[in-house]
Amino acid sequence: MTDLKVLHSPEIYLFNSEQRQFGANVLKDFLYYIKFTGKKGLINFSFSANEDGLHQNLSIKENYILDAVPSSLIKNSEDNFIHTSENLTNPHLKDLIARTNCIERLVKDLEREERKLVGIVKTILSNSEYIFMDSPDKFISPETLAIIKAALEYESSHNNRKVFLKAATKERWLDIVTHWISKDESGRFTKSKNQLLSKPNNQTSNVVELKKAS
């Protein structure tokens, strides 16, 4: 019998970073927004920083294992990363891993785009409910960015993960972002649907004002 996985409507949020109400600490904005909408308890997230945020003196593989591979898949201090990557269901994530070839290389020896990509892959690999990314399009070629976007869409629709983005160039994300997040001077958030993805006959309002959870 085939195991049919339930697909979810993607949730990919782009923060309007052009607004001065959003600070330089984008991670703080992401977390505050989630708390603002009523999320209780700990927030299970992975974060790809504007700068790569990697362990420079470790290899690509060691970075993946340290933060992304579950400890149950690491046996006797020897990683099982090849087995893990081969069994990934996200084909686009597999493609991104393949682009970080020669994973025994040290991060400090990588080119700028490679370092950025390793940080993005590590974030997607992590088993988290939320994916936070600060400028994931920065230093990334159009070809690679297309694969990153496909990987994020897959994670959101197949694995029910919510993706939050602050883009270096927001226009590069208009084809996959489902919602815009804005913030007024009082700190109130507004969530708006990306009308480019809305159905033409949809007559419902595209703007939802979010009140702070009590």
Residue ranges: model-predicted function:
Residues E86-R112:
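Conserved ABC nucleotide-binding domain
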Residues V6-K75:
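ABC ATPase nucleotide-binding domain signature region
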Residues P10, G41, N127, S141-W173:
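Conserved catalytic loops of ABC-family nucleotide-binding domains
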Residues I131-P136:
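Catalytic Walker B motif of ABC-type/P-loop ATPase nucleotide-binding domains
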Residues D175-I176, K183-S214:
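Conserved beta-strand-loop-alpha-helix hinge in the C-terminal portion
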Residues S71-H92:
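Short coil-to-helix "N-cap" segments within the ABC nucleotide-binding domain's helical subdomain
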Residues G119-I120:
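Hydrophobic anchor residue at the start of the ABC signature
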